[in-house]
C-alpha cells in the first residue's frame, strides 16, 4: 500500500530475528524443492550468503542457477544477488580467512570502449632516430610472472572476441557467455586442455576464483591450448622474422620485460589481433608497444620505454680501420674481379652487351621523344587526343523490337483514353497515333478488339464516345497492316517570336505561321533584285557549262512535289539503309533519324560520346519512332579518326552488317564546334577540318573501295553533304567555312573521278535552324532576321527538307548530276548577315534596357503611392518535411461491381499477407519500389536510404552545442533538414546501392580483382629455418616426414623447423575474377543500427542478421508492434516459421571449411551456425518464441515461393494460423565463382568492356542478355488466415489464391529450365463448360444448402458465421464444408477444372482478370524463352482472350538475382502493384529478344504503366534442381466483398486505429535505432507453467500472463492501443470527469491516482489476499480470465481511493479490506460509505463529507492504472 510515512523503514533487530526464525521453520517443514527455492530467493529480506557444507560442490551450483531465474522475475527494486559458497571450494571465504598473496588482477579496471580488432592502418609507425643521449634501459615498476589468471583471462577473452581488459573477472563463464551452452562447453574443454583438470561447476565460478583454484598447480608457462593460440597468432599476424624469440627480445630491449614477464602480454595478444597480417617490422613494433601499454594499464604498473630501439639504429661510435685491413680488402676485391672475368670469358658472356643495348634503347627513346615533341608542337595535344579511335564492335547497340514497343504504347494509350473517358484525347494524340500506326501488327488489332468487347457491357454516353474512338483506331490499324510505314510531317510551319516582358525579361516563343501548309509556305521566296528570277525559300540549283549554280525550276518542282507528299500521304523509307553521323540531342540529324525510323528505314548512327551515356537517347528515339521493319544500330565512332572511318565502312560491308551489306544514304553531319580567327588557329581547328572535310572524303573513298570489291555497281549510295551558307560571312568560326566550301569540290570530283557509279552527291545548304546546339543562343534574334525577308527553320522543318531529298525522285536525279539543294531560306544571298545580326542584337538589347528602366521607375512610383510601409506577400519558400511511414494498403469502400460472395468463403482456410519486408541492394521494400516504378526516390525514400547506409542519424538533444531534434550528418554531426537530404546524398546513395562494383566492406573483405587460390609447389632446395611452437613443429613433421627436420631451441618450448628438398607446399596466389559486379546490401548497412545486440552480430551469420531485420519490419508493416500480441489470439504452436535459404549461411560455411583448413582462429561452436535451419531458429529464439513447426525449404532460386507454398498449406489444412515465410541468401565468392564456371552469370568484366554500366549488367528479356547478376538479401511475408487477420484488425495486402510447386521430366542437367509448372493449368476441354465456374449457380446452390443446414439446426443463428458453441458445432462444420465445396476449392467437385482457373473462380474471377506476371527473368538466354513459352502456353490452354496480354515485370533487372529471396521480392512487388495500380517497367530491356515475339499473351513494358485496376497477379519462379513454382495473388478488395457491410466497417475502423498506432512506433524505432526488438524472455512470466501452457490448446498470453480465454475465429474485438501510463491516466481522468454524476449542483472533488505493475501482485500469498481483499472481491477476481490482472486492478483502485481521501497514512502494513471495490453499472465504483467503508477509512470519509467515490481502472502493457474521484457535498 503506497502510503507515505515518516517512520524508519528498516525493521528492528528483534523483527529481523523473528523473520529469520519464521523462514527457518518454513524451510524445515516445506521440503519441496520449488517452494524451498521460492522462499529462499523471493522472500524478504533477501539472503546474502548461501553456504553448502558437503564433500562436493552441487547444491550451491543448482541454487545459483535457480537464483538467476528468480532474479529475472523480481521487480527492479529487488535486492542484490546473494553470494554462493561451497565448503569444498570456498573454505577461506566461509571462514573469513584472507591471504596476502600477490594480486593477480588489479583492484579496479579502467572502462574501455567496445573492442574492435586492431587495424594496421591505425598503428603509428615508429621511426627510430639517433640520439645524442646515452641509451637508457627500461625498468618496469613491478616485475610480474605469468599467473593462471592471466591464461584464464586470455583464453576467455579470445573466445568471447573481446579485448582482455574488457572482460570483468568477477563474472562467471556462464554470465560472460550469455547463457550459450556450446560456448561454455567449448571454453571448459580448453581449460581442461590447458590445466589438466577443472573443478566441477567451473562455469559458475568467477574468473578470479578459478585463477586462485588453478594457481597452486600452475607451472608458470603457457600450456598446450595457450601455446597453440600464441603460435597461431604469431604465424598468422606477425611479419616475417618476428617469431616468439624476436618478440621477447624486443619487449626486453624496449620495455625491460624479462622473458617471464613478456609472456603475459604475449598471452594477451590473441585477444586483440590486428585485422590482417602486419606488413613490416615497424607495424609489428607499434602493435607490441600498444599491447604492452594496455597490459601495464590493466595490471596497474608503470612501464617506461627505453630510448634505445633494438633494431640496429641506435647511436654508434665511429668505426676505425687500419691500413693493413684496407689493403687486404682491396686485394680480395681484385681477386674476385679476376675470377668473374675468367668465368664470363669461359661462358662466352659479354657483360658489356647490356650496356650497349641500354645505350641503343636510350637513343631510340630520344628519337621517339623528339617525334612526340614535334607532333605536340605542330598539332598540339588536343589534336592528337582528338584523332584517337573509339570504334569498338563489342559496344554496338542494336534496336529492332518495334513489335513489342507497339503493344506497350497501344496499351498505354488505351489506358489513358479509358481513364479519362470524358475528353478521351490524351496530349499529342495525333502524333502518338501516327507513330503507333507505323508499327501496327495483328496483335495490336487484337488488343483494341478486346477493349471494344469490354466496353459492350458498359453502356453510357462517355463509354459510347470511347467506343467510337476505339473503333476508329481499330479501322486505321487494320488498314496499315498491308502498307509500308510512312513518315508524315504534320506539324504546322512555326515562326520565331521574341518578347520583352514588362519586367524586362527576354522570352522566346514559337508560333504557327499564317500559312498552315508547310510546302505552300516554302513555295514563297525572299525579295530578289530586279532582273533576277524569284526562287522559293528552298529550291534546287543546277549548273550549266561555264555557269555558276542557278535556280532550276524543274528540279525544284519535283522537290516541292515530294514535300507535298510528305505532308499528305507520307514518305516511306522501307528497306532503306542509312548511315548518319553527328546526330546528338537537339541536332538536325536527330530529327532526320526520327523521320527515317517512322518511314521504316534501317539506320546506323554513330556517337562520339561513350555508349553508356548516349544509348538511352537513341533507344528512347527508337521506341517512339521505330516503325515496322526499322532498326537502329548505334556505333561508337570518332569521325576525326581515319581508323574509325575505315573500320566502320568495313563492318557495314562485312558479313555481320546490320544493313545487309550496303548503304542507300550517308549523312555525315558530325561537326566539332570551333571559334577563332586565323591568328588563333590551333589543334582544335585542324581537328575540326579533318572531321568535317578530310574524313568525309575518306568515307567516300572507303565506301567506293568496298562497293568495288563487292561489285555493287547498280545501287549507288547518295551522300547528303551538310553544306552551309556561311562561307566566311559570320567570321570568327575557325575553319568551319573552309570545311563547308571544301565539300563543294565533290560536285566537280563527281565528274573528274571514277567513283560516280558507286556514289552520288546531294549538297544540302542548311539555313538558319533554330534550337540546335550552335544556334540556341541566337534564337532571340531570329524574329529580327526574318524581318529582312529571309526565313528560319525549326529542327523538324529542316529535317523534313532533307528527308524530301532522300526520296526516289530526287535520288534518281542525283544519279545523273549532283544535287545542290538551297535550304537557306534566302539567307545564302546575304553577304552582310553578320552586320544585320549585330544590329538586331543591339536593337533588342536597347529595348530590353529601356523596359527594365521603365519597370524600375514604375516600381518606385508604386512604392511611393502605396507607402513604403506596405508589406507585400513575399511568398517565402516552404520547406517540406518527410512523412516516414509503412505505406499501409488503402481500405476503400466495397462498391457495387464486385462478385456476390458474401458469406461463401471459409476465411479460416484463406491465407492472406498482412505484412512484408525485404532487405536488398536498394534498401527495403519501400525504397526498392520507388526506384523500380519511379526511377528515383521520394523525399521519404532518400531519408530511409540515408539512414540505412549510415549517412544520417537522428538526434534528440544537442547538436553543435545547441538544443536540436532532427537528423544530423553521421560524420560531422551537422544538423540537416529533411529537404536537404536528396541533394546532399543523392550521388553517394546511387553509387553505393543497387548493382555496383564489388568493393571490400566492413562485413566482407572479398576483392574480386585479387581472388585468392592455393598453388601446390614442390620444394627444390632446402629452405631457411623458421621458429614455431613444439606442437606445431611436430605437426609439420607428421605431414612432411623426412622432408622436415626439427631442432629444439634451448630454454624454450619452441622448435626451429627446417623444410628440406622434396616437401610439398601450398602457396597462396591471387588471380583477377571477371565477376566484379553484384547487388549487395547498400554500403554502410549496419545490423547494430537496427538494434541487434553486438554479441548476436558477432555470433550469427549475416543471413540471420538480414532475417532478423526483415521479420521485425514485416511485423511492423502488419501493424504488430510486438509479435507476442499474436498469442492473445492463437496458441504458440499455431505459428509456423518457414524461412528458407538457397545457399545457407555462406560466411559461416566459408569460415568452417576454408578457414578451418587454413588453421585460422574460428569459433569452436561454428558448426551450430552452419545449418540452414539455424537462421529460422535464431528468428524464433530472439523474436517469436513460438512452438509451431520450423520448416526450412531449400529450393535454390525458388526457395521463397516454396516457403510460401509450405506456409499456405499449413494454414489451409488448419495446422497453423500464422506463418513467417520468405527466403534469404548472401553473396558469396565461392558461389559466384561456381556460377561463373557454368556460364550462368554475366561476365561483368566483359560487359563493362562493351560499354555497359554495372546497373545494366542484368537485362532480362533483352536481346543482348548474357546471364544474371548476383545479389544478396532477404524477403519476408507474414502469412495469416483471413479470419485471424480480420479479427486482429490487421492490414491485408493480398490474398494468396494459389501456390503450386512442380518438378520436371527425366534428364541429366540440373540447371535445365523445365516446364513442370504447366501442370498448374491442367484441364480437359469440357472443364471450361462446367457449371461450377458460374458464380451465380454456385451462389444459389450454396444458399440452398445453408438453408437446409439452418432448418436442421433451428438453434443455429441465421448468420453464416459459426460461433463454435457446443450446440452449433455440427452446423458450423456443415457450413464450412459447404463453403469449401462451393467456394474455397471447387475442384473437390470437379477435378477436371485446372487449379489456376479454380483458384480464381473462388473470388468470381477468370484467367482474363490476371493483369500482371512477375517473371523469374534471370537474364539468361534459356530462361526467358522457356519461361515465356510456359506462361504463354498456360494462357493459351486456359483460353485467355486474345488482345489481353499479361504485362511482364522483370524485377531482377533492378535487383539482380538473390536466389532464395528472389520470389519474396517479386511477391512484395506484386503486392505493391495491386496497392498502387502501377506496373513497373524493365528499364534495362533496351531491345526485346525477337524470340519472344511469338508469345502473344505477354507484353514486356520498359516504362512504368498506370492501369485502372489490378485484380490479380501471376508470379513464376524457377530454381536449379527441378524447382518450378507459381503463385497467384488476388486483390484484398475481393476478400472484403465476402464480408458483410457491418463486419467490413468494423474491421476497417479497427485496422485504421492499428495503422495510426504502428506508424509512430515505426518512425520512433528508426530514429532510436531499435527497429529490431530482441526478446530476452518468453511471452510467459512464469516458466514453471510453460509445460501446462504447451499442453492446453486454449492457452493464450495477454501482457505476459497466461489466460484460458479462447477467442473464436470470427469474434471481433477492439484493438487496445498500448500507451504510456501517463497518457492512460490522463485519458481515464478526462473520461471520468465527463461521465461523473453531479446530482448536486454544488459539489467539490479530490483525485487519487495509483499505478502498479501487474507482476508485482503476489496472488500466491493467501495472507496477502485475505488481508487486503473482501470475500466478494476475491470471488470476482478468482473467476476472471486473468486473476493476477484483476487483483492488480482492485489493488490500484484501493490505493487511488485512499489517496483521494487526502489523509495521513497509518503505515504500509495497513490492511486494505476496509475499502471494497464493486461493479455498479459495469463501472468500478466505491459505493455509499455508510455500508462499505469501515474503520479509519470510514471515519476519514465521514469527517470530510465525502458521499461518493468513483473509480476507473485500465490496463496498459503490464501495468494496472486507477483514477479515483472523491465527491464532497458542499453546504
From Swiss-Prot:
Positions of modified residues (O-(pantetheine 4'-phosphoryl)serine): 181
Keywords assigned: Fatty acid biosynthesis, Fatty acid metabolism, Lipid biosynthesis, Lipid metabolism, Magnesium, Metal-binding, Multifunctional enzyme, NAD, NADP, Oxidoreductase, Phosphopantetheine, Phosphoprotein, Transferase
GO molecular function list: 3-oxoacyl-[acyl-carrier-protein] reductase (NADPH) activity; 3-oxoacyl-[acyl-carrier-protein] synthase activity; fatty acid synthase activity; fatty-acyl-CoA synthase activity; holo-[acyl-carrier-protein] synthase activity; magnesium ion binding
Active site: residue positions: 1197, 1416, 1457
Domain (Ketosynthase family 3 (KS3)): residue spans on this chain: 1011-1531
Polar residues bias locations: 108-130
Role, per record: Fatty acid synthase alpha subunit; part of the pki gene cluster that mediates the biosynthesis of 2,4-dihydroxy-3-methyl-6-(2-oxoundecyl)benzaldehyde. The first step in the pathway is the generation of the decanoyl starter unit by the FAS composed of subunits pkiB and pkiC, which is then transferred directly from the FAS to the SAT domain of the non-reducing polyketide synthase pkiA. PkiA condenses the decanoyyl starter unit with 4 malonyl-CoA units and performs one methylation step to yield 2,4-dihydroxy-3-methyl-6-(2-oxoundecyl)benzaldehyde.
Description of how the protein assembles with itself and partners: [Alpha(6)beta(6)] hexamers of two multifunctional subunits (alpha and beta).
Protein name in the entry: Fatty acid synthase alpha subunit pkiB
